[in-house]
Amino acid sequence: MSQWGSGAILVQPDSLGRGYDGDWHTAVATRGGGVVQLNLVNRRAVAFMPKVSGDSGWAVGRVSLDLRMAMPADFCAIIHAPALASPGHHVILGLIDSGYRGTVMAVVVAPKRTREFAPGTLRVDVTFLDILATPPALTEPISLRQFPQLAPPPPTGAGIREDPWLEGALGAPSVTTALPARRRGRSLVYAGELTPVQTEHGDGVREAIAFLPKREEDAGFDIVVRRPVTVPANGTTVVQPSLRMLHADAGPAACYVLGRSSLNARGLLVVPTRWLPGHVCAFVVYNLTGVPVTLEAGAKVAQLLVAGADALPWIPPDNFHGTKALRNYPRGVPDSTAEPRNPPLLVFTNEFDAEAPPSERGTGGFGSTGI
């Protein structure tokens, strides 16, 4: 990798290493703001063997892109559909870490009886994005004296509680730490864990960490739930992992909540959304499995990607409609106009194993997370 410079991205279509014409036609494109993409379209019929097929009419499966990549630590790859949506099926937005060395997979949702994609009908884009390693700036814990309704339930309580701000209880304009008191059109489950504490300012709460620290090779910060959350069959649940808000003066960075490859492949889709400053984090989990699924306490359910302010303009804020998990992103939104900090150089190679730098992650999992 060093011979190409620190900003190089190594790419090896599997067909290069095997000496044959592969299943995918791959082209390089430069989008607005200097963003670099790979545009893939299947040149042959591609088999589709779904692992999840409930009674929703949809099947979920993984499709190999016959591609391996090695990126600098300050880059990730976004797997998504092209702007022109393919008819009848959906490429679920995915996130690839810089340390992943295995074959890249796309998670595809297709009509239940689909078993292959005819030549030229499956199109997938890989967008390379420079990211920030700085964790998001969050507000301080909330005082129980100000908001006694946030006191955690007794140990014998009923478990998950609906977030109280949906009822407008925290909308007092005179309190600077009040959560946004606007409705989002559906119920929302607070999945954090609160512990009462004594502080120099009086009674308060300590909230368990909802956004885990990330390693150098990780693209995003894992988002965990601290209580069990059940997503109904063929339905949705809006999850709020923390009571903390993103600081209003968070700077030029933008925070995006994206799904995890392992959950996407199981038919539990996180609707991509942008987390706006001054708001709490909330996102939709859409269950296509046909049976209720419980996310256990401590489960990693989504990822928080911190990037430039205009990095992903096609991911809207407050994206709280479950069916939008099946939307092909991007659609109808102009390209980014922000210049990447370090525009990447794509290098195609047939000596990937020899030229790619070592990685802690290796070939584990199939993209952003392990299975």
From Swiss-Prot:
Residues 350-371 are annotated as: Disordered. Belongs to the dUTPase family. Its cofactor is Mg(2+). Involved in nucleotide metabolism: produces dUMP, the immediate precursor of thymidine nucleotides and decreases the intracellular concentration of dUTP to avoid uracil incorporation into viral DNA. Residues 362-371 have a biased composition (Gly residues). One of its GO terms (molecular function) is dUTP diphosphatase activity. Its EC number is 3.6.1.23. It catalyses: dUTP + H2O = dUMP + diphosphate + H(+). InterPro entries: dUTPase-like, dUTPase-like_sf, HSV_DUT. The keyword Metal-binding applies. It comes from the Viruses. Keywords: Hydrolase, Magnesium, Metal-binding, Nucleotide metabolism. This is Deoxyuridine 5'-triphosphate nucleotidohydrolase. GO terms for biological process: dUTP metabolic process. Pfam families: dUTPase. Substrate binds at residues 260-262, 366-367.
